Regions:
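Subtilisin-like serine protease catalytic core
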Residues: 1-40, 64-130, 147-151, 161, ...
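Extracytoplasmic/secreted envelope proteins and their assembly/folding machinery
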Residues: 80, 133-136, 170
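Conserved alpha-helical segments that form or flank metal/cofactor-binding pockets of metalloenzymes
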Residues: 50, 58, 66
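Subunit-assembly interface segments of extracellular/virion macromolecular structures
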Residues: 137-141, 149, 153
Length: 183
């Protein structure tokens, strides 16, 4: 089959090709994702059985194929399934939009000085507002390139904002919601 993911930006990986117009991270195209998934199927790789994910190299080491980003806590995968999961009659499941394609951003961990300033304990995941804003910009850029409308799911799981529409991220999202083809 083919991945539902049209494009993936891993903000935490600095080793690959950056998305156009962005200064960090690695972008994965659908073609690259499908090639890696097919390679793993051909070699019998099962990422769940792999012990060390730190080198980001696929089990198909003779071709030195890079591994796709991993969803460490499963939150993004869970939300993607709700949004666009394929119908599974045996499990009585279907995502809200099973025929939808996905543009995915794996946010990077917030910088150490910010984690210390906000007293965020080690082991607790957090991200920076500017990285979220750039993630939204990336998703919109991909949708525009494809000429497709887009619905954005921002299931981050954390937000230090006032939740009153006054901070930068909230104002940015409000502005974008006024644009055509974005919801």
């Amino acid at each position: 089959g083919s991945s539902k993911v049209v494009s993936l930006w891993d903000q935490s990986d600095q080793r690959g090709t950056r998305p156009e117009g962005f200064l960090y991270g690695t972008e994965w195209t659908r073609e690259e994702i499908n090639n890696i998934l097919q390679s793993d199927m051909d070699t019998g790789s099962n990422r769940k059985d792999e012990k060390n994910d730190s080198d980001n190299i696929s089990s198909n080491s003779k071709n030195n194929v890079r591994k796709l980003p991993n969803d460490e806590n499963g939150h993004g995968t869970f939300l993607a399934a709700i949004a666009a999961g394929r119908e599974d009659i045996d499990q009585i499941f279907s995502g809200v939009a099973p025929d939808a394609e996905l543009v995915v951003v794996k946010l990077k961990q917030s910088k150490k000085y910010l984690r210390e300033f906000y007293s965020i304990p080690d082991g607790v995941w957090s991200c920076q507002e500017d990285d979220v804003m750039l993630a939204v910009r990336y998703v919109i850029n991909v949708a525009n390139k494809l000429g497709k409308p887009i619905s954005i799911c921002l299931g981050i799981g954390t937000n230090l904002g006032g939740h009153n529409g006054a901070n930068g991220l909230e104002r940015y999202i409000s502005y974008l919601s006024l644009l055509p083809k974005i919801s």
